[in-house]
């Protein structure tokens, strides 16, 4: 670095802009650029290390959020469709994700699952999925929950074909809610009827 400074001092300084440009060009083309290579590598490292850390931290955060979302989806499948045929469990997972994609519902799986809306008849907030108002416990080591977790992952990562395209609602076959009259029936799977 000291050699570079001495060479700069040795230069005769031109008095015009054109002279400055010619001097700089000739200096650049005739000098050894290995010193600049070191500075370039150092500068690149200074930029890449923080960028790499930022990417790793964001990836870890996204991975943690994905796990949380998958857990909420699995719990919803477990509570809403446990005991249903596999097609019914996949359909419940699809409805949950269809709601996330819809502008009429919250933007994350956990927010959709635990959403509460005001019910004029009951004069209180009620859960979109009935199990969220009841006992929320589940056996994470049970085969039913393991199946729900597997289904959640497959539907979340779009590894299966949709069964109930665009369905946003469903109810059990043994009830007849008034809102169902205004919806378009998409499918009947197991003990659930699905609507757009």
Model-found features: residue ranges?
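Bacterial extracytoplasmic/cell-wall-associated proteins, especially those involved in peptidoglycan
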Residues: 2-40, 50-196
């Amino acid at each position: 670095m000291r050699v570079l400074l001495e060479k700069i001092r040795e230069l005769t300084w031109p008095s015009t802009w054109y002279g400055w440009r010619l001097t700089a060009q000739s200096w650049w083309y005739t000098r050894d650029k290995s010193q600049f290579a070191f500075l370039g590598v150092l500068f690149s490292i200074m930029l890449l290390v923080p960028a790499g850390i930022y990417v790793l931290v964001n990836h870890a955060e996204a991975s943690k959020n994905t796990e949380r979302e998958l857990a909420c989806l699995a719990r919803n499948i477990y509570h809403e469709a446990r005991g249903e045929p596999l097609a019914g469990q996949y359909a419940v997972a699809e409805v949950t994700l269809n709601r996330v994609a819809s502008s009429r519902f919250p933007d994350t799986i956990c927010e959709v699952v635990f959403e509460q809306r005001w019910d004029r008849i009951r004069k209180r907030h009620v859960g979109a999925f009935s199990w969220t108002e009841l006992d929320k416990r589940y056996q994470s080591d049970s085969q039913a929950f393991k199946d729900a977790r597997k289904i959640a992952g497959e539907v979340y990562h779009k590894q299966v074909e949709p069964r109930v395209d665009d369905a946003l609602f469903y109810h059990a076959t043994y009830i007849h809610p008034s809102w169902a009259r205004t919806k378009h029936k998409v499918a009947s799977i197991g003990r659930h009827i699905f609507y757009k």
